[in-house]
C-alpha cells in the first residue's frame, strides 16, 4: 500500500467523520470538501455526481410534501395509531410493521418520525420499555428503503440489474419478502428474550421520581383537512402507477417494448403528476410547501447524498482496477463478503442509494456479470439489504429522534457511542435479510 493511497483513504475517512461530527448537512458539505482535496491536492479524477439519485429524491419528497400539507400524512398516522392502540400487546411487531410500510409507500424513512410518540405512549401503557419497539421500528424504516418501489436505491438497483436479465417484479418480490421477514424475526427475538419490563428500568424509575416522564395520555386531535383522504388515494394511486409502469417496461414482462420514458424519468414525472393533482384537488397553498418538515429533511438528504456519493465515487473510480481484482477474488469465493462491504460502506456513506451507486457497478465488473453470464447476479440481489447500516453511527435523524422522544430513558446512546439501543436489532435485521436473500433469490431468479 503506497503513501498516495494512504493519503487518499485518510481524506475519504477524514471528510466523512468530520461531517458526522459536525452533524446535519455538514456530511454533504465535507463530502464536497473531500472531493476538492482528492482532486486538487492528490490528483484524483473527480467521480460522477449522482444526479439521477438526487433528482429521484427531490421528486419523491416534493410529492410527500404536498401529501403532508394536504393532511395525508396525518391521515395515515392516525390510521396506524388506531391499529397500535387497538393491539397494544403486539406493539413490538406492529410498530416495525407500520414504519416499514410507511417507508415502502413514501420512499423515505423519515415518515417514522410521526409514529414515534405513538409508539412510546402505547409501550408505556403496557409497561413495555419503549426502546424495544422503537429500536426495531427505526431499523425497519431504514431497511424498507431497499424494498420501496419509489426509493432512489431501488430505482438505481433495478436499473443496474434488469439489463443483466433480472426482472423488476422478481426483484421487488425478493426484497419485500426478505426484508420484512427479517424485521419480524428480530421483533420475535426482542419479544422472547428482550428485557421488556419498564418498571424494572433504573433510568425510568429515576426519571419518574424527577417528574420527567409524561403521564400516559391519548391526547386530543384536531380535525383533518378536508382533502386529507383524497391526497392519500392520489398518492397511493401514483405509487401503484409507478410499479405497473416499471413492470410493463421490464424485458421479462415486455408490455412496452421500446419505452420512451425510462424508469428514472417515469418515477420523477409520476411524482410530479401526483404533487400537481394533490395541489389542485386539495386546493393547497403552494407557498406553504417549503415549510413542510418532510420537504426540509428531504432536501437536506439531497445535499448529503450529493457530497458523500460524489466523494465515494471519486475514491472508488480512482482505484477501480484494484477494487475489481479484490472483489473478484474475495466475493467470487465468499459471496457473503459483499454484504459485509456494503454494510461498512453504508455506515460511512450514510445513504442506501449512494452506497449502491458507489459499490455495485464495480462489483458487477469485477465478477464479470453479463446478460449471458449472470449466474452470480443473485449475490447482488441477496446482499442489497446490507446498504441499510445507517444506524451504526448514532447520528442519523430518526435514531436521534427516537432517543429524544422516549421520555422513559430506555432508548439511549451509550458512553462508548456504538453501544446504543439500535445496534443489535439493526445488525440482526441485516444479517437475517441477507441470509434469507441468499436462500430466496436463487429460487425466485
Located regions from the model:
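Alpha-helical transmembrane segments
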Residues: 52-61, 173-187, 259-271, 379-393
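Membrane-interfacial helical/loop segments at transmembrane boundaries in membrane proteins
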Residues: 158-163, 253-258, 324-330
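Terminal transmembrane helical module of multi-pass membrane proteins
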Residues: 352, 396-404
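Membrane-embedded alpha-helical segments and adjacent helix-loop junctions characteristic
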Residues: 18-20, 30-33, 44-128, 132-133, ...
Amino acid at each position: 500500500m503506497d503513501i498516495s493511497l494512504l493519503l487518499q483513504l485518510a481524506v475519504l475517512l477524514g471528510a466523512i467523520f468530520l461531517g458526522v461530527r459536525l452533524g446535519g448537512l455538514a456530511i454533504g458539505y465535507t463530502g464536497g470538501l473531500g472531493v476538492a482535496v482528492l482532486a486538487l491536492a492528490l490528483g484524483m479524477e473527480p467521480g460522477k455526481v449522482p444526479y439521477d439519485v438526487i433528482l429521484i429524491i427531490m421528486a419523491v419528497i416534493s410529492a410527500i410534501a404536498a401529501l403532508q400539507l394536504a393532511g395525508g400524512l396525518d391521515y395515515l398516522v392516525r390510521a396506524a395509531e388506531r391499529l397500535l392502540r387497538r393491539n397494544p400487546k403486539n406493539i413490538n411487531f406492529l410498530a416495525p410493521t407500520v414504519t416499514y410500510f410507511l417507508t415502502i409507500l413514501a420512499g423515505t424513512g423519515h415518515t417514522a418520525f410521526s409514529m414515534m410518540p405513538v409508539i412510546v405512549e402505547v409501550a408505556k401503557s403496557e409497561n413495555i420499555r419503549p426502546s424495544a419497539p422503537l429500536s426495531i421500528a427505526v431499523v425497519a424504516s431504514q431497511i424498507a428503503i431497499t424494498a420501496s418501489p419509489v426509493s432512489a436505491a431501488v430505482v438505481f438497483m433495478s436499473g443496474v440489474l434488469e439489463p443483466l436479465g433480472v426482472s423488476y417484479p422478481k426483484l421487488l418480490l425478493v426484497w419485500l419478502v426478505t426484508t420484512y421477514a427479517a424485521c419480524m424475526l428480530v421483533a420475535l427475538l426482542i419479544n422472547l428474550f428482550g428485557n421488556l419490563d419498564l418498571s424494572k428500568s433504573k433510568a425510568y424509575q429515576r426519571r419518574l421520581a424527577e417528574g420527567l416522564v409524561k403521564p400516559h395520555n391519548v391526547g386530543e386531535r384536531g380535525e383533518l383537512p378536508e382533502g386529507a383522504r383524497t391526497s392519500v388515494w392520489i398518492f397511493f394511486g401514483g405509487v401503484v402507477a409507478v410499479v405497473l409502469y416499471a413492470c410493463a417496461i421490464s424485458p421479462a414482462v415486455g408490455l412496452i417494448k421500446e419505452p420512451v420514458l425510462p424508469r428514472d424519468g417515469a418515477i420523477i414525472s409520476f411524482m410530479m403528476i401526483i404533487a400537481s393533482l394533490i395541489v389542485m384537488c386539495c386546493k393547497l397553498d403552494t407557498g406553504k410547501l417549503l415549510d413542510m418538515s418532510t420537504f426540509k429533511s428531504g432536501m437536506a438528504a439531497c445535499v448529503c447524498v450529493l457530497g458523500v456519493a460524489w466523494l465515494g465515487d471519486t475514491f472508488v473510480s480512482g482505484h477501480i482496477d484494484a477494487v475489481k481484482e479484490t472483489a473478484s477474488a474475495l466475493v467470487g469465493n465468499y459471496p457473503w463478503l459483499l454484504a459485509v462491504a456494503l454494510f461498512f460502506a453504508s455506515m460511512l456513506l450514510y445513504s442506501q442509494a449512494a452506497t449502491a451507486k458507489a459499490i455495485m457497478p464495480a462489483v458487477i465488473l469485477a465478477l464479470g456479470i453479463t446478460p449471458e453470464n449472470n449466474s452470480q447476479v443473485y449475490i447482488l440481489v441477496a446482499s442489497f439489504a446490507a446498504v441499510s447500516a445507517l444506524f451504526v453511527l448514532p447520528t442519523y435523524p430518526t435514531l436521534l429522534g427516537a432517543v429524544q422522544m422516549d421520555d422513559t430513558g430506555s432508548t439511549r446512546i451509550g458512553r462508548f457511542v456504538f453501544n446504543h439501543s439500535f445496534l443489535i436489532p439493526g445488525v440482526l435485521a441485516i444479517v437475517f435479510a441477507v441470509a434469507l436473500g441468499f436462500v430466496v433469490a436463487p429460487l425466485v431468479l
